[in-house]
Structure formats: C-alpha cells, structure tokens
Amino acid sequence: MRILFITTQNPTKQGDLLEVSLLHGLRTVLGEDCVDYPRKKIMYHDFSDTPKDTLHGRGFSLLTTPIQDIKDRDIFNQKFDYVIYGDGHMYGEVPDIEGVNDLADGNVWIIDGHDLYGDAPRMISHNGETIIGTQFTNCFKRELVETDDDSVYPTGFGIPEERIRKVDFSIKDQLYQKTAPSDSLFEDTVDMGGGFSHHKFTDEEDYYDDLSRSWFGLTCKKGGWDCLRHYEIIVSGS
C-alpha cells in the first residue's frame, strides 16, 4: 500500500497533534511507501521555519527523535493507492491540490481533527449541545459522534512506542504531576485554551520524569485542549 500524505503548509500551524501523530505512525509502518508532501520539516528536526519551542506542547513526545527521510519525492511521477489530506483545512487550506488527487485515481481521504467545541463550517446539535460535526465524507474523524455515514471512520491521537516507560513504584514521591490542569484541582480555570502559560517544563525528559514520579496523572474535560496529555500520562506510568 502506498500513501501520499498532504501536510499542512502554513509554517505557523505545523504542530497539529493529529496530523503529526498519524504521519509518524504511517511512516513507521510503511516506510518509503508513505510520502509526505510538502515535506514536513519539523518531523526531520528541521525547525528553520518553525522553531520547536513555538509548537503546541513544545513538540514534546511526537518529535523526540526525527523520522527517517525518504529518497524519492518526485510525486508526480509516482502512483499511490490513497491520497490523505492532513488537517490543513482547519487552517484555511483547501484539501484539493491541482493534479494531486489523480495520483491515486481519485481515492482521496481527509483527516478531520476538529475538537467537539469551537467553530467550524458545519455545526450540529448533540445531546443538547451545539458541537462541531463531521466536515467531510471519505474522512477519518477525531471525536466522532455521528455514525450514519459509512465513509467516515473514527481516528485519534497516538504516541511513539519509544516514549513508553516501565512503571517504577520505587521513584514515586509525589501525589500528582506539576502540570495538572487547575480545573482538575477544583481551582479557578486559568490554563485552558492552549498557549504556553501551563507549560512548566522546557526539557522533555524533565517533563516525563515528573509524570513518572507521580502516583496519579490528573486531567479533566477541556474541549480538546492538550489531549496528548492523556497519552503522556499513561506511557509515563503515572
């Protein structure tokens, strides 16, 4: 199976967690049979256009080590089984690049990484709330609640296997991690909605050490904010 993965072009939107985690997984499984276009520089530790410390979550976990590059990027002289568009549509990039869809004979899919809450072209009512609905057919949808379209499949974040730590009870000396969201502690909510105020660590291993020495990893419902934290809590052995 060969996949052409169309990445987000905007250099200020390179840290989309779903796009990065799926591309990491596909490249790990398929190797050179998964071609990223345009070349997603941050995945190869080229931060010349996008400094790592400006990325959501500072690039922790998904960018610990670079993925292996591929040799042939002349996509218009290749054929693919699938074209998959990443989350560029969430940042104003139309998922339809001239000539690209023909490379897989129109077998085109889209990743839809919208949270349940926020703004998007298509909103729906669900359980008494107005939430973001599925935006496309032939797509892989994060936080899928509509199940009446057979061309829409659920998907979610992942985390590289290299980040999994063994549980070590001998090092646990604090009840919960220093990065616990204020809402999970029943305090005034001051750290939702992204940003960097809640990023207490600038070194990734220090961040994981703090999680590993915690008996519990606290989290809370937060409208899609920092959902990778759930995975980081689990793999660190909290």
Functional labels for PLM-detected ranges:
Residues 2-238:
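Nucleotide-sugar donor-binding catalytic core of glycosyltransferases
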